[in-house]
């Protein structure tokens, strides 16, 4: 009971599907192997392929992205208390400072094109997660960008970002 997610990481690459890894913490966990009565179980057939996703910076779709990843860390704090009944259980599981970050990998045709997208201004990033699902990160800034000094045919670079938040994950 009282399950909250501690960390979640969502990523996608060319020729792949969206992948997610989540860590949950709970106030009380009961371990069992029995299935819930009345529930139905089936393999999930709705994997979201890379070509069903998108990344937008503000209102502009970024068509030079080859890989993307975002992380949400709630940094949960486990708070036990001394008590006689159920002393092994946590009393509280509050959220602490939420950390929002991620990384985009780009393939640019020119340094000018890279400079336009990687300008040092605050922005919103929207990640399409298939269908009408999306994750929107507000008040983002580029955190770490390394642009090669020599220009080849294509300019490949990774751009890390951090967001102040909030983040909205919707399916509307």
Predicted segments with their positions:
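Signature of extracytoplasmic/envelope-associated structural regions
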Residues: 1-172
